[in-house]
A protein has these predicted regions:
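Interfacial loop at the N-terminal end of multi-pass membrane proteins
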Residues: 34-60
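Hydrophobic cores of alpha-helical transmembrane segments in multi-pass inner/ER membrane proteins
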Residues: 66-73, 125-133
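Core segments of alpha-helical transmembrane spans in multipass integral membrane proteins
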Residues: 27-28, 32, 54-77, 91-98
Length: 142
């Protein structure tokens, strides 16, 4: 792994961008917990912000945490992933989780074709990424 010099003068290993993406998604999920808390404690305030489905806020919050953590783990457990795995995994993890936010604001959006197409594309991306991760790990096993 490449080394970078940090401000203190020590050398530290460069962090894989996929790991950074996963950790950022995980942190975003942690922060969305505040919004979910608002949904649970002050429904009127949440509604005034445009939230129509608290259940979808919960799904958004949990998916960001789960997929962010799994993405960070993936980039750590199997370093130097090929681009055909790295990009679909990183993009799919974000788009899968983020697809719940529009549903929180407009539950009927799931009936619209553009939304459905986007969700299918996201599932394809995530499926390619996680399957590619498993295949890459199996090939490197030994």
């Amino acid at each position: 792994m490449k080394r970078k010099s940090c401000r203190t003068g020590r050398n530290e290993a460069a962090i894989d961008p996929l790991v950074v993406s996963g950790l950022t998604e995980l942190a975003t999920g942690a922060l969305t917990g505040w919004l979910y808390t608002l949904v649970k404690t002050d429904r009127e305030k949440a509604r005034s912000l445009g939230i129509k489905s608290g259940a979808r806020v919960r799904q958004w919050h949990l998916d960001l945490i789960a997929l962010g953590g799994l993405t960070a783990m993936a980039g750590t457990a199997v370093p130097d992933l090929p681009n055909w795995v790295r990009w679909p995994l990183g993009i799919g993890a974000w788009t899968n989780a983020m697809s719940f936010l529009p549903l929180a604001l407009d539950p009927d959006i799931e009936k619209r074709l553009p939304f459905r197409v986007a969700v299918v594309a996201s599932f394809v991306s995530t499926s390619v990424g996680f399957t590619g991760l498993a295949l890459t790990a199996a090939r490197r096993r030994g």
